[in-house]
């Protein structure tokens, strides 16, 4: 049985409190969503503190990113959420966070991707059953034109159907899952790996 709107709204609110508490979604940054139906998603409204979300801070949109609730404005980055739902129908939740580690690492790396290899925690990602693999995380340059940014992201996703998340340079992380708990697990796994990568680089003098 699919979750109700009330249940999905509660999941988004609780995700905000958890992610804010970990320091991964400071102030009004970040945005979260959940699939409501094949053609609709629930998203956080624009400009709200993610540690203080209430039921009125979530709205329904169509898959083109248009608000279905007059008077409520979705996040400017709504298209980056809805394109993930149209990319894979099994995706049920999308989380976009603004942690220090994701922001710094995405600025530090000058190439267009970050590769993790041989970390045991890679098995926390959906579809990964061994540490003996590589996870390629693309890094897209930030762009205030979200439609243009989305048009760069989608071809990469289509060419890499095993992608589990991506970074926007100097901005943050996007990751997803079949349900909200799956997406939260992937955020936590990414943050562990980002922390490891930054510490390794510091120790190696890079």
Swiss-Prot record:
InterPro entries in the record: Aldolase_II/adducin_N (IPR001303), Aldolase_II/adducin_N_sf (IPR036409), MethylthioRu-1-P_deHdtase_MtnB (IPR017714)
Pathway(s) of this molecule: Amino-acid biosynthesis; L-methionine biosynthesis via salvage pathway; L-methionine from S-methyl-5-thio-alpha-D-ribose 1-phosphate: step 2/6
The keyword Lyase appears for this protein: yes
Keyword Amino-acid biosynthesis among record annotations: yes
GO annotation terms (biological process): L-methionine salvage from methylthioadenosine; monosaccharide metabolic process
Keywords: Amino-acid biosynthesis, Lyase, Metal-binding, Methionine biosynthesis, Zinc
Catalytic activity, reaction form: 5-(methylsulfanyl)-D-ribulose 1-phosphate = 5-methylsulfanyl-2,3-dioxopentyl phosphate + H2O
Pfam families to which the protein is assigned, alphabetical: Aldolase_II
UniProt EC number: 4.2.1.109
Binding site for Zn(2+): 96, 98
Cofactor: Zn(2+)
Cofactor note: Binds 1 zinc ion per subunit.
GO molecular function: methylthioribulose 1-phosphate dehydratase activity; zinc ion binding
Domain of life of the organism encoding this protein: Bacteria
Gene Ontology annotations for the cellular component aspect, listed alphabetically: cytoplasm
Described purpose of this protein according to its UniProt entry: Catalyzes the dehydration of methylthioribulose-1-phosphate (MTRu-1-P) into 2,3-diketo-5-methylthiopentyl-1-phosphate (DK-MTP-1-P).
Sequence similarity: Belongs to the aldolase class II family. MtnB subfamily.
Protein name as annotated: Methylthioribulose-1-phosphate dehydratase
Species of the source: Azotobacter vinelandii (strain DJ / ATCC BAA-1303)
